[in-house]
Amino acid sequence: MTVNLEEKRPEIVGPEKVQSPYPIRFEGKVVHGFGRGSKELGIPTANISEDAIQELLRYRDSGVYFGYAMVQKRVFPMVMSVGWNPYYKNKLRSAEVHLIERQGEDFYEEIMRVIVLGYIRPELNYAGLDKLIEDIHTDIRVALNSMDRPSYSSYKKDPFFKV
């Protein structure tokens, strides 16, 4: 699917309160990916092991989702790409989580817990890397705005994150 990036995207997505099928909770080990998030995009992502995301991939459409994720006992807002990454022509469907506001070293082999609270947009193909990066930054802004509502922000303290 291609999109006209000149069209105005909403600044907030989802209903006022979290509704079914959300929240979706899962956990999995952070594994090595393609190394593109940090190097090419300047937007580091954590790839979740295939076995941990099979259920998610079976029942969720490809696209960009938002919610919270915990790694190393810290909870962060996140955006997650689920799909084939058509710009890169991936052969396997994957789930890649970008922890918003997190800086620091890699955390390969750590267990990440994820709560998905909503859907931002479908997976798209891009003519150039700059448009992809621009859209990811828009996704981050939309996710933060959407999670600023009390029904969503309360999930930052969800019992799923108590370990």
UniProtKB/Swiss-Prot annotation:
Its EC number is 2.7.1.26. This is Riboflavin kinase. It catalyses: riboflavin + ATP = FMN + ADP + H(+). Keywords: ATP-binding, Flavoprotein, FMN, Kinase, Metal-binding, Nucleotide-binding, Transferase, Zinc. SMART domains: Flavokinase. It is an enzyme of class 2 (transferase). It holds the Pfam family Flavokinase. GO terms for biological process: FMN biosynthetic process; riboflavin biosynthetic process; riboflavin metabolic process. Its cofactor is Zn(2+). InterPro entries: Riboflavin_kinase, Riboflavin_kinase_bac/euk, Riboflavin_kinase_dom_sf. Binds 1 zinc ion per subunit. Belongs to the flavokinase family. Catalyzes the phosphorylation of riboflavin (vitamin B2) to form flavin mononucleotide (FMN) coenzyme. GO terms for cellular component: cytosol; mitochondrial inner membrane; mitochondrion; nucleus. The gene is fmn1. The active site is at E96. GO terms for molecular function: ATP binding; riboflavin kinase activity; zinc ion binding. Zn(2+) binds at T45. Pathway: Cofactor biosynthesis; FMN biosynthesis; FMN from riboflavin (ATP route): step 1/1. It comes from the Eukaryota. Monomer.
